[in-house]
Regions:
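Short, flexible turn/loop "capping" segments at secondary-structure junctions
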Residues: 55-56, 159-161, 356-360
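ATP-binding N-terminal substructure of ATP-dependent carboxylate-amine bond-forming enzymes
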Residues: 1-122, 126, 141
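Active-site nucleotide/adenylate-binding loops and adjacent lid/helix of ATP-dependent enzymes
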Residues: 2, 113-206, 210-228, 232-255
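Phosphate-binding core of ATP-grasp and ATP-grasp-like enzymes
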Residues: 184-240, 246-279, 283-291, 307-316, ...
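A conserved FAD-binding loop/helix module that cradles the flavin
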Residues: 293-295
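Peripheral (often C-terminal) accessory segments that flank ATP-dependent C-N-forming ligase machineries
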Residues: 3-9, 307-391
Length: 391
């Protein structure tokens, strides 16, 4: 991915206040991007099919259309100086078609890599970074051969699409394999997929790295807890061996330089019981596990993303205070709102979504603390998240 100056052949060295940033996707990530950009003086446009979506509520204008509507993407580009996106399932070809109208400093190479799990794994491995063992599979026959090599337990994922556990099948035994056989086409084929071996991890973690196409900085490594395949809680910083932390920062910088990163990249990690760092997935955008940075860091992930795509300089972010971030899903809206008056320490973020649904991310709460373990216990003791209690 080029810097903004390279993307525009020197026409724009850096984006200045008053310029317009067009965001593809109008959910909470786009909303928080837009809020950061507005503080810096930028105008905001958004493309989203839902009128008055969360991003549109804080934007200057909205193009209301589907994400793959090339005419709508062109309209957004014509009204913008720079394009960015809040999720990775964006039509990369469509972005390439409008780059003469608006710069796309993130480029499309990173999009194409992260849209295909096989390409993603290859890129990560080619840059000297370990992943779980994996094999590309397109049929039951190929799956059986891959299982002979990787063994149970393993997880079968579609090569593209899927989030929060969607498009995934856990294989623990022959009985699970039989279910895949039953769903396959008559010739044994199924959607292009990847089989990944299970990692015996101590905990899940993530690290954010930001770049402007030339310079790169990393945020603290955080510990993540998922429940029902959805991120539940992030603890910053993660308590871990300094050598392991250094390795994680180095691999993040290595991947960022490999992409010539402009904007932010989230790297989901497994930290194994023998202190190895394994990369799970990449996300070429701000990440749920980085929301704590809004209160806890010298500048947050959304600031870093906007500065990166605008060609502004980047300073190494500092953790000002440890923090715990917990997601507020649809079923948690009522109980958390009922307790807001009792918890002045809660930094409450509501995404202003029109429809409240079970398991839908509606907001988050961040607590700054000197004792993350106590804060975790205090949050759980409220009972707001009892439906997500560990089995």
């Amino acid at each position: 991915m080029p810097s903004l100056s390279e993307e525009t052949n020197g026409r724009i060295e850096r984006l200045m206040p008053g310029a317009t940033i067009g965001i593809i996707g109008g959910g909470q990530l786009g909303r928080m991007m837009a809020l950061s950009a507005r503080y810096m003086g930028f105008r905001i446009g958004v493309l989203d099919p839902t009128p008055d979506c969360p991003t549109a509520q804080v934007a200057d204008f909205q193009v209301t259309a589907e994400y793959d509507d090339i005419a709508a993407i062109r309209e957004l580009a014509e009204k913008s100086d720079v394009l960015t996106y809040e999720f990775e399932n964006v039509d990369a070809d469509a972005i390439d078609q409008v780059r003469s109208l608006a710069a796309a400093p993130q480029g499309t190479d990173l999009l194409r890599v992260t849209q295909d799990r096989v390409n993603e794994k290859r890129f990560i491995n080619d840059h000297g970074t370990p992943t779980a063992p994996w094999k590309a599979v397109n049929s039951v026959e190929e799956l059986e051969a891959a299982l002979d090599e990787i063994h149970y337990p393993a997880v079968l994922k579609t090569r593209s699409g899927g989030y929060d556990g969607h498009g995934q099948t856990v294989l623990k035994s022959e009985a699970d394999l039989e279910q895949v056989r039953a769903r396959a086409d008559h010739d044994g084929s199924f959607l292009p997929s990847i089989l990944e071996g299970f990692v015996d991890f101590a905990f899940e973690a993530s690290i954010l790295v930001a770049g402007n196409g030339k310079d790169y900085v990393t945020f603290p490594i955080v510990r993540n807890e998922h429940r029902n395949n959805i991120l539940h809680m992030t603890i910053a910083p993660a308590e871990m061996d300094e050598t392991v932390a250094k390795e994680a920062h180095e691999l993040a910088l290595r991947l960022a330089k490999g992409f010539e990163l402009a904007g932010i990249l989230a790297i989901e990690l497994f930290i194994t019981k023998d202190n190895k760092v394994i990369v799970n997935e990449l996300a070429p955008r701000p990440h749920n596990s980085g929301h704590y940075t809004i209160e806890a860091c010298s500048f947050d992930q959304f600031d870093a993303h906007i500065r990166g795509i605008a060609g502004w300089p980047l300073e190494q972010p500092q953790l000002l205070k440890p923090a715990v971030m917990v997601n507020v899903l649809g079923q948690h809206v009522a109980p958390t709102r009922a307790l807001i008056a009792d918890h002045p320490e809660w930094n409450v973020h509501d995404y202003c979504k029109a429809e409240v649904r079970h398991d839908r991310k509606m907001g988050h709460i961040t607590v700054l603390t000197d004792d993350t373990a106590k804060t975790v216990a205090d949050l759980e003791a409220t009972g707001c998240w009892d439906d997500l209690k560990k089995a």
